[in-house]
């Protein structure tokens, strides 16, 4: 699923991965912290397009969500960086390709802060192997444990 199950109060949205009926990853989206908290700023969804022929879902989003900035009981504080971006999820054979395209470069002050966050559901992955960017390992049996090489 891509940007279909959105729960703004719980700050849940983005790319969710479901394999054999079990959610294995969620909240795949751009965030301003590597491990976002409950009251962290989230983007505003502008559009979502499904292209069945190319097996692609494209979602257009923006920061900040001006309707949420500094409002409510626990006000959200958006960083001073306005931009629009697209998250594209494409099925290619037995793989999923996720790409993120921003409408402008990331300012130097946000390098290392603005990141694509994908939260894995650890108990399903404990002890299972992973491969990413020519690296491989085994998921730890504790959520905060070391990843085995």
Segments the model singles out, each with a brief description of its role:
Residues 1, 21, 53-55, 133-134:
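Intrinsic-disorder/low-complexity loop/linker signature
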Residues 1-4, 10-15, 55-66, 98, ...:
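Generic recognition of long tandem-repeat/solenoid scaffolds
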Residues 1-43:
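Beta-strand-rich N-terminal accessory domains
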Residues 1-9, 79-89, 149:
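Broad, structure-driven detector of short, well-ordered beta-strand segments within folded domains
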Residues 6-9, 20-22, 35, 62-68, ...:
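Generic structural motif
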Residues 32-105:
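Extended, loop-rich substrate-binding clefts of extracytoplasmic carbohydrate-active enzymes
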Residues 97-141:
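Acidic (Asp/Glu-rich), glycine- and aromatic
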């Amino acid at each position: 699923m891509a940007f279909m199950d959105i729960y703004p109060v719980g700050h849940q949205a983005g790319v969710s991965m479901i394999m054999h009926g079990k959610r294995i990853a969620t909240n795949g989206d751009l965030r301003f912290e590597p491990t976002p908290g409950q009251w962290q700023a989230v983007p505003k969804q502008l559009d979502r397009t499904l292209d069945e022929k190319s097996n692609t879902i494209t979602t257009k989003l923006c920061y900040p969500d001006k309707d949420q900035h500094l409002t409510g009981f626990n006000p959200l504080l958006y960083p001073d960086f306005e931009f629009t971006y697209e998250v594209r999820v494409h099925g290619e054979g037995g793989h999923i390709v996720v790409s993120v395209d921003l409408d402008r470069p990331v300012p130097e002050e946000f390098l290392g802060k603005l990141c694509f966050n994908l939260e894995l559901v650890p108990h399903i992955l404990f002890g299972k192997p992973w491969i990413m960017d020519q690296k491989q390992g085994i998921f730890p049996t504790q959520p905060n444990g070391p990843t085995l090489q």
